[in-house]
Amino acid sequence: MSKVKMISPAVPNVPWQDKPEGHTGAPVWRYSENPIIGRNPVEGVARIFNSAVMPYGDEFIGVFRGEQVNGIPYIYLGRSKDAIHWDFDKNKIQFVDEEGKPFMPIYAYDPRLVKVEDTYYIIWCQDFYGAAIGIAKTKDFKTFTRIENPFLPFNRNAVLFPRKVHGNFMMLSRPSDSGHTPFGDIFVSESPDMVFWGKHRHVMGKSSEWWESLKIGGGAAPIETSEGWLLFYHGVSGTCNGYVYSIGGAILDIDNPSIVKYRCENFLLTPEEWYE
């Protein structure tokens, strides 16, 4: 592989910490002041995690999974000047339908946040006769309009590409069952309008490597590079103490993201700290 160059626009004022002295192994490292957000920074929320963050104007904006004190997860909005110190809205995001009427999911968790052209999209897992993909759009982070049930159940881990490919929206997902499924591969689908999805293609599945021998699923939005779409994804292994989730990497073809050009043999990050 030749030297890879970024094509996706750089994130302005992104917080950065140089590689720790003596660091070896994977080419990524943890921020030394982790965790940057406490367990329950919002009243009535027992745990907040699984964030999706991006720049918005002169600040950063994020959507977060917040598990309420009754255990039901919803999506909460947060704002930050530096992506490290966060202020959260006290109330969960209020979704509406195309007519502006309330359209709230029974639950919502594991959000992703992606901007395509002039619109921001939130993608999450919701209930639609089991685990299913939820999508909403906004331009001002004040009004959040849901797109009704874009995929059949059971599906989750939806990841939207940050630009159209051949004029269509592209999305990764992981069809599965309705529980903590012990299986799952990554697929890619396309749509002309974010409503009707088709041309479903298989991207990749689990491997013989132990860290991703059970199932895999999409992570953050793909990053466009000179070699293709850089995808960070999660791989899962099963242990006698439960599932272990690690981060892997792959590069997908720029014009046909169902083609995997490169894939990491080893994980990039795996749980090591107390907060993980």
Labelled PLM ranges:
Residues 1-106, 114-214, 223-276:
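Beta-rich carbohydrate-recognition and catalytic domains
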Residues 220:
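Catalytic core of Fe(II)/2-oxoglutarate
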